[in-house]
């Protein structure tokens, strides 16, 4: 599979540099094509390392839900304990994702992600030794920190791939990483059964099973450290040491990010697409097990089908975002995002009202495609909000996903205030409501859903260089933003790039 940006018609300059890179690159040495089956360094190797590391972290974080019927019996977990554990698994990553964004801006995605992955792996191993509900909640909380590798994944892809294909790269990397949420629904029951067949009791088997995701999480971190590279031109630490890359002012990086209102809207909307996905990962196996009286492995297979849709749904969202951009520019990306996320919310609301097992499975599968595609569409927009504070904006958006999951589980799925069916329906309504602010995102150089570009003829260079003051420009600290502005002309769309703004 190869995705190629239409550089000529979008204003993106593509160059080929066979001596340095296997893929054609732009002025920032970002790849202008995406070759899925290549492992060429640095672009495609970074892609495969990032999605696999994120996949392993997702498997570890959600390894418990498919075994909950056994775990709750062993630890005497109440409905409140299970709800609190689900909330804990996604709440830790709220702070971690914000910090990860800043860490990527300052130290690079390679070191930042590997450090987090290694530091959270012990929580997965320690799950084998817990003896109380409090212990269960704590290990899920600390293991959930690893979900912040999502931010480093998106940052890394945005650093390696040019605008016309960045949506595809982000969507596929995140989608295949999120696939871990579905894969673990299959992996853990199978591992549990294998250990049981070797003679272990069920209360021992589930504990031993947690060493498998912990081991793979650890190995993925070492692979990133050994084989990864932060940027097309090298690693952050080496470029800082040689003077090729100046260290940015952390205060200004954070300030620019949080002052950009667009980042807050992407965080809100992402809270009710990815947040919904995280919530479903936590509740869906138990939901089908209890409501339709299924066997543990059968419920696990059905639940797995939701997460496994990430194999194509989220990548499809990213690819669709790039397609709409080539035809209609940034405005096309925004419209596609809103339509898909709203449709996902409608399907989610319907799911909670269906009492037939067969129809529930069908609606859940269609719903999974839309909600996961909406996640991919979100990160088709995020890379263009800020060049200087990309990590901060990515972190804010990613954290928004976890905040949405925490609030949803706290309000609708903690205790017995709502039935699971009612909670799922209300979650869908919230998703529809939180997609509405997407219409408020406006770029003066490109426009928004309902408005065209500013009458003041603001250019891409005006927008991205506004993040730097005159003193910083005199030191040439803005060069990266200037190059990014040149390649971002593609976001004007096919209808306007033939008549560039002046």
From Swiss-Prot:
Keywords: Cell membrane, Membrane, Nitrate assimilation, Transmembrane, Transmembrane helix. Expressed in roots, shoots and seeds. Expressed in leaves. Expressed in root hair zone of the primary root and the lateral roots, but not in the lateral root tip or in older parts of the roots. Detected mainly in the epidermis and the cortex. Expressed in shoots only in higher-order veins. GO terms for molecular function: nitrate transmembrane transporter activity. Coiled coil: none annotated. Disruption phenotype: Loss of plant growth and root system architecture responses to the rhizospheric Phyllobacterium. Decreased nitrate uptake in the high-affinity range. It is found in: Cell membrane. Belongs to the major facilitator superfamily. Nitrate/nitrite porter (TC 2.A.1.8) family. This is High affinity nitrate transporter 2.5. It comes from Arabidopsis thaliana. The gene is NRT2.5.
């Amino acid at each position: 599979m190869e995705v190629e940006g239409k550089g000529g018609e979008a204003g993106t300059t593509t160059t080929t540099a066979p001596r340095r890179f296997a893929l054609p690159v732009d002025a920032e040495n970002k790849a202008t094509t995406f070759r899925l089956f290549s492992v060429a360094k640095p672009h495609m190797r970074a892609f495969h390392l990032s999605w696999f590391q994120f996949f392993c972290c997702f498997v570890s974080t959600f390894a418990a839900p498919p075994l909950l019927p056994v775990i709750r019996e062993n630890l005497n977990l109440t409905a409140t304990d299970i709800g609190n554990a689900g909330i804990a698994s996604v709440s830790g990553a709220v702070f971690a994702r914000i910090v990860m964004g800043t860490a990527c801006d300052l130290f690079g995605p390679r070191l930042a992600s590997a450090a987090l992955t290694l530091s959270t792996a012990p929580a997965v191993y320690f799950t084998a030794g817990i003896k109380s509900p409090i212990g269960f909640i704590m290990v899920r909380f600390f293991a959930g920190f690893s979900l912040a590798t999502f931010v480093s994944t998106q940052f890394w892809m945005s650093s390696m791939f040019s605008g016309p294909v960045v949506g595809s790269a982000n969507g596929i990397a995140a989608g295949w990483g999120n696939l871990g949420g579905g894969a673990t629904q299959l992996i853990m029951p199978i591992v549990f059964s294998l250990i049981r067949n070797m003679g272990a009791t069920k209360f021992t088997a589930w504990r031993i099973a947690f060493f498998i995701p912990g081991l793979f999480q650890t190995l993925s971190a070492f692979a990133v450290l050994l084989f990864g590279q932060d940027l097309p031109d090298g690693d952050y630490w080496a470029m800082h040491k040689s003077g090729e890359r100046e260290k940015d002012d952390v205060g200004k990086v954070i300030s620019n990010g949080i002052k950009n209102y667009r980042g807050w809207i992407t965080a809100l909307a992402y809270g009710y697409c990815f947040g919904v996905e995280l919530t479903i990962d936590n509740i869906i196996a138990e939901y089908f097990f209890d409501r339709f009286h299924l066997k543990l492995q059968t419920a696990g297979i059905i639940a797995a089908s939701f997460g496994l849709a990430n194999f194509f749904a989220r990548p499809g969202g990213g690819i669709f975002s790039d397609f709409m951009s080539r035809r209609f520019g940034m405005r096309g990306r925004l419209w596609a995002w809103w339509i898909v996320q709203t449709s996902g919310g409608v399907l989610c609301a319907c799911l909670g009202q269906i009492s037939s097992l067969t129809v529930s499975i069908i609606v859940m599968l269609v719903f999974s495609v839309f909600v996961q595609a909406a996640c991919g569409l979100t990160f088709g927009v995020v890379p263009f909000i800020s060049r200087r504070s990309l990590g901060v904006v990515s972190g804010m958006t990613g954290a928004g996903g976890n905040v949405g999951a925490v609030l949803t589980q706290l309000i609708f799925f903690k205790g017995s205030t709502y039935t699971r069916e009612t909670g799922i329906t209300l979650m869908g309504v919230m998703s529809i409501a939180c997609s509405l602010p997407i219409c408020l995102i406006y770029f003066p150089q490109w426009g928004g859903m309902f408005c065209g570009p500013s009458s003041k003829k603001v250019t891409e260079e005006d927008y991205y260089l506004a993040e730097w003051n005159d003193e910083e420009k005199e030191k040439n600290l803005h060069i990266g933003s200037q190059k990014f502005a040149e390649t971002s002309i593609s976001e004007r769309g096919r209808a306007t790039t033939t008549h560039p703004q002046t």
